[in-house]
Amino acid sequence: MNQAPDEYDVVVLGAGPVGENLADRTRAAGLSTVIVERELVGGECSYWACVPSKSLLRPVLARAEARRVPGLRQAVDGPLSAAEVFAHRDKQVGNWTDGGALTWLESAGIDLVRGHGRLAGPQRVAVTPPDGSDGDERVLTARHAVAVCTGTRAALPDLPGIAEARPWTSREATSSATVPERLVVVGGGVVAAEMATAWNGLGSRVTVLVRGSGLLTRIEPFAGELVAETLREAGVEIRTGTSVKGVARPGGAAGPVTVTLENGERLEADEVLFATGRTPHTEDLGLETVGLEPGGWLTVDETCRVRDVPGGWLYAAGDVNHRALLTHQGKYQARIAGAAIGARAQDVPLLETDRWGAHATTADEAAVPQVVFTDPEVAAVGLTAEQAEAEGRSIRVVDYDMGQVEGAVLYGDGYRGRARMVVDLDRGHPIGVTFVGPGVAELLHSATVAVAGEVPIERLWHAVPSFPTVSEVWLRLLEAYRG
């Protein structure tokens, strides 16, 4: 027998970083809030993506940087201890338990219902037990809003034999407790580049198969070129213009994988990772009960309210709305959406939805920051030169060799990197900045502030970088721009 409906002001589907942030904002607005989660509180990022992947990458990148420092390289000449790296990774993900996250939820006054949540009509969510048993269904009713924060899952291509071959997705690649002797990585994006870096550093013989022309093609072209150059020097084989037509594991679970290419060539590996994109977790959310198509991305307005839903009670934040598939950007959307839900619940007559307003996700279009944790690191925000030109903007592009900055010279021998600033000539401020080089991740927020703040070039001239730091690249870019 079903329980009587439970009423909350806000029901959130998905307890990843996006759902947690949205719930935190609605609680801050004084709204009762419950999160529904079928797996671990903390979500994909905490257990199978951002946190474990960077835990694997940190020792690999630290060793690479140490090897460039005179007097230190001999001390780090040996192989990494995979066992210690895995133990550190496991600690960072709480050994795939969510006790710490539960403590935070309780402290924030957010309720949790474990199970699979599906929409059951306007402002109603039906929750079935997480183990898939035939236990009682629980129905939650939202007085003001339901927020879908269910994220995405790995998208596997429709290839013969792929299901039986049990390939790695990003989940297996970040949680494996053994180092495959041979690893084939299919894809050329961020996950492919990072996992090729990590597993090569841990001792795998890695082959990367890229259907397109190179790595990281959504960023400035020189980024992927520099990353590929270093990977090849480290022994990674990168094949571009290469497509896979089949995969098989004929020997069973413990046997090798055979990857068949379009040209008929066969590659044998111990594991194959498909890093070929993401698909939204919307196929079993009951979207059809509110007039939406299951399985697709949810289209939202600037407040993350789902379009074409009568009553305006349904929101979608994070990867599921396809605006910017990055954890930090999803958390940003969650803060905006949570504030909008709170304002509407309080009958605020006019929300601040103008550009850069309190209830507008403007940064999704103008200032999305991203770091790729490879060697060298890639850090970018805003538009590339190609994207700016496609929008019809009048721009000027300024490039600088980061290896010429004194801070980079001191950072390590043979520092290789490049910086680019894209300036909107009509507005007089940067609309895109890209850094490639060891340690540039920590430079990115300065660029994000410049782009999101629309800081004029003439004002940036007065932002003096400390000497001798790598951040002096800002001065070099501005000098090149001013002439």
Where are these regions (language model features)?
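Rossmann-like dinucleotide-binding cores of NAD(P)H-dependent redox enzymes
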Residues: 86, 91-98, 174-175, 180-184, ...
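Short hydrophobic core segments
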Residues: 11-13, 117, 140-151, 185-186, ...
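N-terminal Rossmann-like dinucleotide/flavin-binding domain of flavoprotein oxidoreductases
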Residues: 2-8, 45-139, 219-245, 385-387, ...
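Beta1/beta-strand and adjacent pyrophosphate-binding region of the FAD-binding site
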Residues: 2-16, 179-189
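Flexible, glycine-rich terminal cap/loop adjacent to redox cofactors
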Residues: 13-39, 51, 55-62, 368, ...
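FAD-site-proximal beta/loop scaffold in flavoenzymes
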Residues: 163-179, 266-357
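Glycine-rich FAD pyrophosphate-binding loop
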Residues: 27-45, 204-215
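A Rossmann-like FAD-binding core segment of flavoenzymes
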Residues: 75-76, 111-114, 118-133, 202-302, ...
